[in-house]
Amino acid sequence: MARNKIALIGSGMIGGTLAHLAGLKELGDIVLFDIADGVPQGKGLDIAQSSPVEGFNAKLTGSSDYAAIEGADVCIVTAGVPRKPGMSRDDLLGINLKVMEQVGAGIKKYAPNAFVICITNPLDAMVWALQKFSGLPANKVVGMAGVLDSSRFRLFLAEEFNVSVQDVTAFVLGGHGDTMVPLARYSTVGGIPLTDLVKMGWVTAERLEEIIQRTRDGGAEIVGLLKTGSAFYAPAASAIEMAESYLKDKKRVLPCAAHLTGQYGVKDMYVGVPTVIGAGGVERVIEIELNKDEEAAFQKSVGAVAGLCEACINIAPALK
């Protein structure tokens, strides 16, 4: 049986971490791609040289030619410029939109049957543009946001309550940015909703709101600390979880930026929602009941994403 092929488009900090994780988990053979010739080849060689020590079987190669991604089963896209301190994800729009156009053309030509996971920011607009530029079916193109945002929320909650992260589930809806909507009543510790934990005196509503705000600012907090770049370990781990669910047909329930066709009252846009990911790509979008406040917060988030998509159309009218 042929091994799966994983193409990593963009070989920066996230790309290199993705390659290492995909190798350790033996998800398949790995191709690192980057327009900066030498970088993907060097990182591929370095990680490959760890395989005898780590004991994993995966072929790693690097290339600056899109032909190298031919026939990939999964493409994970991190190409583009990362955030610097003081930049919002949206400041990156013009630069990274042009990158998505090139990446979309490369995937369309060489890996039209791939499951594509986009990580490039501003996420919700970039994954929307990438799907249009590539022409791939919308259920085969997703954005990595919710898994990371939920993971941050889970960590902060586990630290607050001094419990294992494994026993914390968290629910985050909406765009990947300042308007994301972490939902407390759908988030649990050992199956107990956070709203009940407030009643039980484990945490005050005010403290919970602080944790929710820290989750929203999770990426910016790391950008501020690093000063020279943005997060890469947790984003890479999050994308690998999605890729693994697709490759192994796990049917994991994972929050992703998915293409909506009327769910939550949203059409032809990518927004963070709970999905089921299996061999068919996004096999299902799970539509939950929102109360009035949650609905208002979600619609505000949708509005922010819509504004970014409009800005994309102004730059590249072909996206309309």
From Swiss-Prot:
Function: Catalyzes the reversible oxidation of malate to oxaloacetate.
Top-level lineage group: Bacteria
EC number: 1.1.1.37
Cited Pfam families: Ldh_1_C (PF02866), Ldh_1_N (PF00056)
Reactions it catalyzes: (S)-malate + NAD(+) = oxaloacetate + NADH + H(+)
SUPFAM superfamilies: LDH C-terminal domain-like, NAD(P)-binding Rossmann-fold domains
UniProt: NAD(+) binding residues: G10, S11, G12, M13, I14, G15, D34, N96, I119, T120, N121
Sequence similarity: Belongs to the LDH/MDH superfamily. MDH type 3 family.
GO biological process, one term: lactate metabolic process
InterPro entries: L-lactate/malate_DH, Lactate/malate_DH_C, Lactate/malate_DH_N, Lactate_DH/Glyco_Ohase_4_C, Malate_DH_type3, NAD(P)-bd_dom_sf
Alphabetically ordered keywords of this record: NAD, Oxidoreductase, Tricarboxylic acid cycle
Organism: Allorhizobium ampelinum (strain ATCC BAA-846 / DSM 112012 / S4) (Agrobacterium vitis (strain S4))
Name of the protein in its database record: Malate dehydrogenase
Root EC class: oxidoreductase
GO MF term (any one): L-malate dehydrogenase (NAD+) activity
Catalytic-site annotation from UniProt: H176 (proton acceptor)
Binding site residues for substrate: R83, R89, N121, R152
